[in-house]
């Protein structure tokens, strides 16, 4: 039967997963009976009890007991085990919690002290292995204990001098309770200092060895802490209990109380502990919160001054009290011996502060010798404390705003410089305004600050400081983030005043500029002017071509710019060749828009096209960059064009029916901006519009065109809204893809050929050579309306009568000289016509070549009514006179 008992025990241990005693009993070879004896279980337990109680410890043994008895026998030991395990688990939990309180916690302060969470865990293991009741100096328990000690010390240092000085009866129950409690707490603190780890000042190592801690404390602050913690009230309570009350009163009558008062003053040595604890808290606040540390220092300084004044006031009254108020003391002279303690304390405090601030002697000048010496001592201490207070307060206030102080010192030097050179008043005012806008009252050594940081943090700060510039620049929005970061790290902040020339014509270009805030005007030899606003950049063409500037840029308002030197420019673009091609593409487009070209850029661009450097993704990025660069252009009408009218209002009021009547049937494969449309007056209004500064995306509001017909889908779009140009581009791109897939035979039939005017060229429907070159390589047809030598969309004038107009496919260079025609016919007629005009001119390519002839039949002749000679752009002999002027080679 014994052999059968062991398997049953093993099976029961498997059923009871939370119990370890069955397995231990089986492992040691002891039988179930031995286990039952240890647990006090009566024999005869059954198996039913083991099944009913999963957390109980029951063993099945062979015996004559019944099932019910076995079940009852199994329940009794289970209850006894749980009753014993509950307090044990609770005690273990409390012990673990208290032990964790003695270890450094994972918080902001400990992470800053030790560096990482793993280092904090390692320090916790050190505390566990250091010994019993070793307290870590950065533990939570020590933190809260120091807070309690700080409150107790402040209370003692304030209440004890008042009680000793102004209260003669010191045997009252509240006073005894306060002193006994204070002495008890300070004795506990004295004992805990022997078990608290210390910090080695030389190596910043935390010492947790109990022997080393004890020796360090005995050599440092033990004597002072022990004297300040002497339980004086315990001694007097013991003496009072052992002596007869009459004898005790007689002893007091014999002025033993004077000794007790002087002995109680030893508690004021607890000030040393207060200073130590305040210093620790200053370090904690400094490492955790920089601003809070400054506030703590201010309150600490003010509190120490008030505490010294409080002590000095109590001392002023204590000395006459110990002398039983002689007739020549200040208390007797002011007749305040029997006054209330509040009045006595007020006069004493006033007298002490008058001495310490060296402003007088208080209510009564010193007469007795003791008052005289106390007054001199008070003056010396007060003068020293006052000097320390002023020095600390001045340094603290200056440290709170050091950048503004540096700015003031710098500007004082500037004022002395202006006075030394006797600069005029207007120039001094400009210098003053520059410093105000450039530094805004604060000066930082930003270069040294950024150089002291690591690379990721420096890049993050630069990106944050230039976030507004990046948000307003389409070039950065479509660029690689690494390129943007590399570019921003090379920028230098500059400020220009209204009227300052940022760049001058003919100067060698050494910088390019990015406008963060402000408006700048581009000044060229022609009358056309252009405004640059937030997000614009200029001056890059000189850095690419190493040439001289052909235009000047002048600040119209205060401009906050970022400049980039030529060396940094080339350094960044060497690492990002795709962005160099983007700058070159924009430069070619800008030069082409003003009718100029640069052979270096064109040769390099053509070489890239021939070698197939561009891929589809880069083509899309370049298209977006060129598109946004055109939208950033802000043209200003010249003064000598009074016929410039508000085309925006005309096109916005045109009805859809009139727009449908004015559309012409021919479909154009490639179009360009008509210069006659830029300056031709609207039929509805003839009032000239003054020049205005527009937003970067509202170029069409300055030079606005009527509704136009999409050249590939015969759909009408409107240009009146500020974003109309962008909308038309987005609408046109998918339609061009559909047009590309259609056969050439699907185009509408052109009108029959008509005889041409002598001397004029045959109209042709042409495709620009540079655009064709892009198409023959990897560029798609969406690039064609945005090519470097071709404006974005066609423009036409909206009128009430619709007649077809011949399409001119020649370049500006091939426009013939005006010839005499039959009166009333052709464009050379005298009267101003209201017939709609569609004059679509191809520009000459950037390379100077004429686009090829596609063999399109010529259009019918113009109607009888024609425009006057002076208002016709087609008859202008000077093709450059009507070209829009844009900034080039800045």
From Swiss-Prot:
Give the result of residue 399 to P, as annotated.
In DEE24; results in absence of hyperpolarization-activated currents; reduced amount of protein at the cell membrane
Sites binding 3',5'-cyclic AMP sit at 539-540, 542, 549-550, 590, 593
Looking up SUPFAM superfamilies in the UniProt record yields: cAMP-binding domain-like (SSF51206), Voltage-gated potassium channels (SSF81324)
Q: What is the effect of changing residue 261 to E?
A: In DEE24; uncertain significance
Taxonomy, superkingdom: Eukaryota
Q: Name one GO biological process term.
A: response to L-glutamate
From start to end residue, where is composition biased (Basic and acidic residues)?
Answer: 880-890
Bilayer-spanning residue ranges: 143-164, 174-194, 216-236, 261-281, 296-318, 372-392
Q: Give residue spans, biased composition: Polar residues.
A: 770-780
Q: How is its activity regulated?
A: Activated by cAMP, and at 10-100 times higher concentrations, also by cGMP. cAMP binding promotes tetramerization and formation of an active channel. Compared to other family members, cAMP has less stimulatory effect on HCN1 because part of the molecules already contain bound cAMP and form homotetramers when cAMP levels are low, this inherent tetramerization in HCN1 results in a weaker response to increased cAMP. Inhibited by Cs(1+), zatebradine, capsazepine and ZD7288.
Any idea where this protein resides? Cell membrane
Effect in UniProt of substituting residue 157 to V = In GEFSP10; uncertain significance; reduced current density; affects channel gating properties as the half-activation voltage is shifted to the depolarizing direction; neurons expressing mutant channels show increased excitability
What would changing residue 680 to Y do, according to UniProt? In GEFSP10; uncertain significance
> Is Nucleotide-binding one of the keywords?
yes
Q: Membrane topology for this entry?
A: Multi-pass membrane protein
Against PROSITE patterns, the record matches this protein to:
CNMP_BINDING_1 (PS00888), CNMP_BINDING_3 (PS50042)
Intramembrane residue numbers? 345-366
Q: What is the effect of changing residue 275 to T?
A: Found in a patient with childhood focal epilepsy; uncertain significance
According to the record, mutating residue 264 to C results in: Found in a patient with infantile-onset epilepsy; uncertain significance
What keywords does the record list, in alphabetical order?
A: cAMP, cAMP-binding, Cell membrane, Disease variant, Epilepsy, Glycoprotein, Ion channel, Ion transport, Ligand-gated ion channel, Membrane, Nucleotide-binding, Potassium, Potassium channel, Potassium transport, Sodium, Sodium channel, Sodium transport, Transmembrane, Transmembrane helix, Transport, Voltage-gated channel
Cite the effect that the entry attributes to residue 379 to R: Found in a patient with intellectual disability and language delay; uncertain significance
Its biological purpose is as follows: Hyperpolarization-activated ion channel that are permeable to sodium and potassium ions. Displays lower selectivity for K(+) over Na(+) ions. Contributes to the native pacemaker currents in heart (If) and in the generation of the I(h) current which controls neuron excitability. Participates in cerebellar mechanisms of motor learning. May mediate responses to sour stimuli.
Notes concerning its domains: The segment S4 is probably the voltage-sensor and is characterized by a series of positively charged amino acids at every third position.
Query: What's the protein name?
Result: Potassium/sodium hyperpolarization-activated cyclic nucleotide-gated channel 1
Gene that produces this protein: HCN1
């Amino acid at each position: 039967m014994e052999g059968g008992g062991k398997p049953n025990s093993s099976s029961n241990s498997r059923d009871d997963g939370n119990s370890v005693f069955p397995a231990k009993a089986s492992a040691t070879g002891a039988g179930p009976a031995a286990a039952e004896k240890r647990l006090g279980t009566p024999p005869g337990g059954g198996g039913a009890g083991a099944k009913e109680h999963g957390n109980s410890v029951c063993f099945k043994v062979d015996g004559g007991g019944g099932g019910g008895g076995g079940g009852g026998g199994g329940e009794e030991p289970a209850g006894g085990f749980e009753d014993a395990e509950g307090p044990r688990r609770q005690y273990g939990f409390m012990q673990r919690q208290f032990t964790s309180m003695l270890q450094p916690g994972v918080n902001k302060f400990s992470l800053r002290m030790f560096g990482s969470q793993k280092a904090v865990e390692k320090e916790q293991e050190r505390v566990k292995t250091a010994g019993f009741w070793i307290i870590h100096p950065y533990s939570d328990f020590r933190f809260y204990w120091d807070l309690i000690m700080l409150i107790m010390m402040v209370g003692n240092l304030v209440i004890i001098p008042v009680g000793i000085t102004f209260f003669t009866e010191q045997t009252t129950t509240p006073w005894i309770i306060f002193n006994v409690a204070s002495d008890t707490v300070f004795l506990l603190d004295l004992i805990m200092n022997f078990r608290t780890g210390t910090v080695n000042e030389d190596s910043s190592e935390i010492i947790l060895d109990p022997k080393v801690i004890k020796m360090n404390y005995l050599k440092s602050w033990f004597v002072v802490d022990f004297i300040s913690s002497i339980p004086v009230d315990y001694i007097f309570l013991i003496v009072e209990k052992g002596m007869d009350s009459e004898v005790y009163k007689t002893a007091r009558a014999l002025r033993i109380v004077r000794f007790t008062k002087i002995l109680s003053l030893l508690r004021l040595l607890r000030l040393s502990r207060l200073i130590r604890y305040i210093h620790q808290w200053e370090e904690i606040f400094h490492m955790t919160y920089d601003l809070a540390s400054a506030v703590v220092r201010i309150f600490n300084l003010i509190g120490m001054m008030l505490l010294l004044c409080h002590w000095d006031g109590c001392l002023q009254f204590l000395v006459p009290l110990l002398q039983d108020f002689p007739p020549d003391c200040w208390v007797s002279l002011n007749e305040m011996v029997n006054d209330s303690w509040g009045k006595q304390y007020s006069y004493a405090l006033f007298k002490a502060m008058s001495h310490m601030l060296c402003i007088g002697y208080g209510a009564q000048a010193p007469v007795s010798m003791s008052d005289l010496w106390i007054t001199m001592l008070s003056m010396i201490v007060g003068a020293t404390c006052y000097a320390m207070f002023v020095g600390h307060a001045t340094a603290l206030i200056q440290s709170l705003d050091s950048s503004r102080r540096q700015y003031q010192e710098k500007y004082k030097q500037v004022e002395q410089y202006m006075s030394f050179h006797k600069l005029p008043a207007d120039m001094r005012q400009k210098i003053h305004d520059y410093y105000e806008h450039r530094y805004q009252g604060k000066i930082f050594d930003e270069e040294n600050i950024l150089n002291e940081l690591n690379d990721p943090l420096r890049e993050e700060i630069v990106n944050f400081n230039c976030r507004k510039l990046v948000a307003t620049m389409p070039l950065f929005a479509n660029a690689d983030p690494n390129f943007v970061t590399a570019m921003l790290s090379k920028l230098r902040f500059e400020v220009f005043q209204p009227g300052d020339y940022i760049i001058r014509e003919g100067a060698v270009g050494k910088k390019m500029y990015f406008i963060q805030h402000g408006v700048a005007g581009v000044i060229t030899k022609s009358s056309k002017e252009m405004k640059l606003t937030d997000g614009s950049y200029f001056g890059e063409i000189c850095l690419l071509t190493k040439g001289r500037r052909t235009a000047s840029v002048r600040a119209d308002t205060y401009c906050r710019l970022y400049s980039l030197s030529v060396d940094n420019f080339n350094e960044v673009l060497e690492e990002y060749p795709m962005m160099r091609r983007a700058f070159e593409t924009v430069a070619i487009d800008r030069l082409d828009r003003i009718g100029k070209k640069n052979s270096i850029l064109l040769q390099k661009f053509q070489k890239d096209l021939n070698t197939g450097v561009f891929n589809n993704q880069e083509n899309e990025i370049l298209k977006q960059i060129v598109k946004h660069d055109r939208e950033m252009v802000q043209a200003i009408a010249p003064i000598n064009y009074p016929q410039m009218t508000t085309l925006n209002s005309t096109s916005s009021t045109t009805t859809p029916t009139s727009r449908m009547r004015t559309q012409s049937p021919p479909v154009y494969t490639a179009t360009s901006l008509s210069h006659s449309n830029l300056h031709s007056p609207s039929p509805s209004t003839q009032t000239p519009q003054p020049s205005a500064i527009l937003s970067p995306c509202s170029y069409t509001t300055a030079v606005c065109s009527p509704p136009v017909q999409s050249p590939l889908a015969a759909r009408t779009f409107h240009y009146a809204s500020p974003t109309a140009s962008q909308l038309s581009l987005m609408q046109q791109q998918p339609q061009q893809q559909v047009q590309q897939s259609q056969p050439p035979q699907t185009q509408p039939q052109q009108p029959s050929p008509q005889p041409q005017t002598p001397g004029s060229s045959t109209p042709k429907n042409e495709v620009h050579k540079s655009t064709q070159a892009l198409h023959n390589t990897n560029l798609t047809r969406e690039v064609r309306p945005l090519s470097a030598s071709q404006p974005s969309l066609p423009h036409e004038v909206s009128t009430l009568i619709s007649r077809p107009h011949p399409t001119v496919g020649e370049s500006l260079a091939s426009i013939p000289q005006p010839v005499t025609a039959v009166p009333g016919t052709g464009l050379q007629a005298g009267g101003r016509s209201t017939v709609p005009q569609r004059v679509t001119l191809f520009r000459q390519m950037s390379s100077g070549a004429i686009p090829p002839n596609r063999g399109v039949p010529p259009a019918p002749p113009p109607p009888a009514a024609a425009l006057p000679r002076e208002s016709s752009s087609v008859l202008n002999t000077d093709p450059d006179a009507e070209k829009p002027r844009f900034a080039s080679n800045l």
